[in-house]
């Protein structure tokens, strides 16, 4: 079942989509009662989008401020996907009393103030991912990949039930990598479109709960529904490079983030703690991976020693191989505590800082010590839906 699409480069058909007047001018007074439906980072974590019951809002992280908002009379959006800091967004209806269907993606050009294309499916859309040359639409059992310029369908990927809409993309233009759940429990499928190669990674025994890629797509970090371990893989050959432990009790992992310099990993969960781990891998790059696949086994290699602080291990790690694996685990290097009331999503900011956004409308910016670790220092905290948040 191919999705239907409507795209007219020279004109615009408003039937069943937005008209150019659907978004009224920003009205900061009447929409402060809007309910928050979703939050999502842009591709480089410099901004985030908030889908509300009355439209959407865009926020800049450093310095923190509301960039703009668009208000609707007909409800809001459960998915608001940005394309870096551009005027292009992907929108999917959802939330209280939304008049926009959950099976339709609207590509909105905010500069033109109109919808420039749409995709309609027969089932609910779980996620939409954008990169400068691709639009990726995630359904529960299938993923569609389109060319951005002409909306041509390029790939269809079957996967097992994916109610969370798990899918991540690389964002360097010299790599084209997509990771998603495979067709078996605990399996991740990695598509290297530029190399015409598929890598199947048996990441966990349980179902995949969360995943992320580095910007170049060479590293993959995953967590399962058990939520105790986070694993880092080489996407070229599927090698597991590192494993870190969030905790002992089961947890629902909300987000995993990798720092741009690939030195740090951040994890948030329903346990009310955001953890940062030190990574011990170095990236050579896809360029070292020739078309003959000559260097697939060493395109990513563990370092002998990390470039910064090391994760604490168990004091009984000298008994590795005798005691259970738990006793040789790497634990988090730095932590920050948030209320256990809602979902929080973490991302790395400027040097040694992380930003955290929550479905309660909270924004935190924190600093961590790259040498000594320990508790992070809170730098900022805003309730971004409130009238007194920076604009």
Curated annotation (Swiss-Prot):
How would you describe this protein's topology in the membrane?
Answer: Peripheral membrane protein
Q: Name one GO cellular component term.
A: phagophore assembly site membrane
Q: Could you tell me where this protein is found in the cell?
A: Preautophagosomal structure membrane; Vacuole membrane
InterPro entries named in the record: PROPPIN (IPR048720), WD40/YVTN_repeat-like_dom_sf (IPR015943), WD40_repeat_dom_sf (IPR036322), WD40_rpt (IPR001680)
The UniProt keyword set, sorted, is: Autophagy, Membrane, Protein transport, Repeat, Transport, Vacuole, WD repeat
Q: What are the boundaries of the region Disordered?
A: 1-24
One GO-annotated biological process of the protein: autophagy
Q: Per its UniProt record, what Pfam families does this chain match?
A: PROPPIN
Segments annotated as WD repeats: 31-69, 74-118, 203-243, 248-287
**What drives induction of this protein's expression?**
Down-regulated during senescence.
Superkingdom is Eukaryota
State how it assembles: Component of the PI(3,5)P2 regulatory complex at least composed of ATG18, SAC/FIG4, FAB1 and VAC14.
| Note on domains (UniProt) | The first protein part may form a beta-propeller domain involved in specific binding to phosphatidylinositol 3,5-bisphosphate (PIP2), leading to the association of the protein to the membrane.
Identification of the protein by name: Autophagy-related protein 18d
Gene name per UniProt: ATG18D
